[in-house]
Swiss-Prot record:
Matches recorded under SUPFAM superfamilies: ALDH-like (SSF53720)
Family: Belongs to the gamma-glutamyl phosphate reductase family.
Native source organism of the sequence: Clostridium perfringens (strain SM101 / Type A)
UniProt protein name: Gamma-glutamyl phosphate reductase
Matching InterPro entries: Ald_DH/histidinol_DH, Ald_DH_C, Ald_DH_N, Aldehyde_DH_dom, G-glutamylP_reductase_CS, Glu-5-SA_DH, GPR_dom
């Protein structure tokens, strides 16, 4: 076991105990100092981020992935503001969610408490570093971060700034830490740090999620993989459908709530597809369509079976013509990743059927999948989008970083 892991695990465990009973004011003061420090030391962050960008370009990293990695002054301000926004959110720790009295006179309550030490493994998104730190701090959890090697310089600087701010706020050393060793061997050891980690949350592509699920012995909350679909019903508004698919695919193609597949009812395909594909191509999107799609719009690439289950995270879209709503639902439930799915329709009964029968964390009617986000849902910053069903599902905000403690008040009762 890597010695860095043991040292940081012990520090995190000690910090988690102190954080568990820190007051809301103490935690909010720490968040305020983090937010202010990120803005004050923006130039330091950008200097380190420049190093990461230069290395990524040398490696031939795609433009979409570079966009996830790149920081500028506005993005750093946005990160700092997201931290400050967490201050405004209600502190769930200590909340008694229910209280009941037993016939023997015992009063039993259910209280929200921190998870303890949260481990987060993620890829080339420096904003995750600050978001995760803020949410864990607010909920009284210590956090150990393991970011991707692509963003190591940016992440180390952000955590350095956070650590200085927490020290100034009088919060414990070890509250927020990051692994400097980004090797796969250390990552695997991190996934098995059961003595110190209470939960492990991976954020990234399918490869990362699979590696964590297959290797971890620490309890895992799966997040992130988004093979999201937009289904255009035969009773859809054409203009609305075009606007939604263009937004869902092109606004930020490298994020997990971006659309990766477009399903179109055969009754509307000849009217819808030429308009939609033209608009998508104008945004630089490569279309990979089924044979029926290619008959309608010839200037596209043919999709393979592999395409239907793939999360591109790029300016690529799979397009398939389906017979009806039932085939669309069947296709989504077979190839989707249970993240976010959307139907465009004017038919109420079709929309209700889609909502009931599609198995996903977020299911939309006449809206872009890009709204699956903690901020957009009003939760503030998120720790990730859970695609599993146990403990948490969908955008994970503050409450999803807590667990229950039973508190029992007696008056001398014995059994």
């Amino acid at each position: 076991m890597n010695n860095e892991l043991i040292i940081k695990g012990k520090k995190a465990k000690e910090a988690s105990y102190t954080l568990s009973f820190a007051s809301t004011n103490e935690k909010n003061n720490g968040l305020l100092k983090i937010s202010e420090s990120l803005i004050k030391r923006c130039d330091e962050i950008l200097e380190e981020n420049k190093k990461d960008i230069e290395k990524a370009i040398e490696k031939g990293t795609s433009n979409a992935m570079l966009d996830r990695l790149k920081l500028d002054e506005e993005r750093v301000k946005s990160i700092a503001n997201a931290v400050a926004d967490v201050i405004k959110l209600d502190d769930p720790i200590g909340e008694v969610t229910s209280m009941f009295k037993r016939p023997n006179g015992l009063r039993i309550g259910v209280q929200r408490v921190p998870l303890g030490v949260v481990g987060i493994i993620y890829e080339a998104r420096p904003n995750v570093t600050a978001d995760a730190a803020a949410l864990c701090l607010k909920t009284g959890n210590a956090v150990i971060l393991r970011g991707g090697s692509e963003a190591i310089n940016s992440n180390l600087k952000i955590v350095d700034i956070i650590s200085d701010a927490l020290k100034e706020a009088g919060l414990p050393e070890g509250s927020v830490q990051i692994l400097e060793d980004t090797s796969r061997e250390t990552a695997t050891d991190f996934m098995r740090l059961n003595d110190y980690l209470d939960v492990l949350i991976p954020r990234g592509g399918a490869g990362l999620i699979k590696a964590v699920v297959n290797n971890a012995t620490v309890p895992v909350i799966e997040t992130g993989v988004g093979n999201c679909h937009i289904y255009i019903d035969d009773e859809a508004d054409i203009n609305m459908g075009v606007d939604i698919i263009v937004n869902a695919k092109t606004s930020r193609p490298a994020v997990c709530n971006a659309a990766e597949k477009l399903l179109v009812n055969e009754k509307i395909a000849e009217e819808f597809l030429p308009v939609a594909i033209k608009a998508l191509k104008e945004k630089g999107v490569e279309i990979r369509g089924c044979e029926k799609t290619k008959v309608i719009v010839n200037d596209i690439n043919l999709a393979t079976e592999e395409d239907w289950g793939k999360e591109y995270l790029d300016y690529i879209l799979g397009v398939k013509i389906v017979k009806d709503l039932d085939e669309a639902i069947s296709h989504i439930n077979k190839y989707g990743t249970k993240h976010s799915e959307s139907i465009v329709t004017k038919n109420y009964f079709n929309s209700e059927k889609f909502l009931q029968r599609v198995d996903a964390a977020a299911v939309y009617v006449n809206a872009s999948t890009r709204f699956t986000d903690g901020g957009e849902f009003g939760f503030g910053a998120e720790i990730g989008i859970s695609t599993q069903k146990l403990h948490a599902r969908g955008p994970m905000g503050l409450k999803e970083l807590t667990t229950n403690k039973y508190i029992i008040y007696g008056n001398g009762q014995v059994r």
